[in-house]
């Protein structure tokens, strides 16, 4: 079936649902590998990607592994001292702000790149992320995004660089660019089919499932990565309905209260369900 692009019309269920949140910014982008159908709503709004930027880090880790520049079984020292891109001054990550605490008790020890990558994705470990970014190089992460032809996505720094944040020097992405990235992984076009399958397996282990997967039917697998910082809440992934090709989906939100994240999760879960019903019936 030929590809067709559908921009959400005013009377569709998705647009109607989003209109219930006039004081929030809600973006959605979908690509259905079965039909080539695309669904967009505010998909080009640029936002802070929060921890969804960990997917590009994972892609560069696997690219360098494929190129023989590193081994996934290589062990990296665990430390908590990093340098701001603003002036090189040192900063440390706050354990309280990290959704994975396990590595902080292991400072001075080591862990494999494979396990650090898993913790970065399934538990959204900030410390694992910064360790991996120092190993592969932040500039290489961003360069690989560009080499893949993914527009409107930039990774320029690691996590919790507060000096950079105060100067608005941040990573950025849109729902459209994130869906483009997840589509390429689903299609096996990032590095190799084997590498994509391995990255999908990592994302299938995601431990935070309050958004895209929450209201989908039983038996539907979702390989995804969540993101949250301040009042940005996102989820990007690949949804695998039974007995058909998957679809790539990215949901970005801004403006939900930081102290009640359930509002954002519930909104994204509803949107995911609406899109699933539209595509699958």
Give names to the regions the model predicted.
Residues 25, 109-113, 127-182, 187:
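Mid-domain, small-residue-enriched loop/turn segments at the edges of structured enzyme/sensor domains
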Residues 23-26, 42-44, 52, 71-73, ...:
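Extracytoplasmic
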Residues 8, 47-56, 107-115, 122-123, ...:
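Soluble non-cytosolic domains of exported or imported proteins
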Residues 83-130:
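Conserved catalytic neighborhood of penicillin-recognizing serine enzymes
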Residues 10-23, 37-38, 135, 179-210, ...:
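Structured C-terminal helix/loop/strand segments within mature extracytoplasmic catalytic/sensor domains
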Residues 4-48:
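Beta-lactamase-like hydrolase cores
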Residues 36, 49-81, 120, 249:
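Active-site SXXK
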Residues 72-92, 136-137:
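Acidic helix-start/capping segments at beta-turn-to-alpha-helix junctions
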């Amino acid at each position: 079936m030929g590809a067709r692009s559908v921009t959400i019309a005013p009377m569709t269920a998705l647009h109607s649902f989003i209109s219930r949140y006039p004081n929030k910014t809600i973006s959605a982008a979908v690509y259905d590998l079965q039909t080539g159908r695309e669904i967009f709503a505010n998909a080009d709004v640029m936002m802070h990607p929060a921890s969804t930027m960990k997917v590009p880090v994972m892609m560069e880790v696997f690219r360098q592994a494929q190129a023989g520049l590193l081994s996934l079984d290589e062990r990296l020292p665990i430390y908590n001292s990093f340098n701001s891109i603003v002036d090189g001054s040192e900063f440390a990550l706050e354990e309280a702000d990290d959704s994975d605490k396990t590595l902080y008790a292991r400072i001075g020890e080591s862990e494999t790149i494979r396990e650090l990558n898993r913790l970065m994705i399934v538990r959204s470990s900030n410390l694992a992320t910064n360790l991996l970014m120092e190993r592969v190089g932040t500039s290489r992460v961003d360069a690989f995004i560009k080499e893949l032809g993914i527009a409107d996505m930039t990774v320029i720094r690691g996590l919790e660089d507060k000096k950079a944040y105060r100067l608005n020097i941040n990573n950025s992405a849109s729902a459209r660019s994130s869906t483009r990235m997840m589509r390429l992984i689903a299609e096996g076009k990032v590095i190799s089919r084997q590498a994509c399958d391995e990255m999908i397996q990592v994302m299938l282990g995601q431990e935070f499932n309050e958004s895209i997967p929450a209201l989908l039917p039983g038996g539907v697998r979702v390989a995804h990565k969540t993101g949250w910082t301040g009042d940005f809440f996102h989820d990007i992934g690949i949804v695998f309905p039974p007995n058909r090709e998957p679809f790539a989906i990215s949901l970005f939100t801004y403006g939900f209260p930081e102290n009640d994240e359930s509002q954002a999760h519930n909104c994204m879960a509803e949107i995911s369900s609406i899109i699933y019903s539209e595509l699958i019936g």
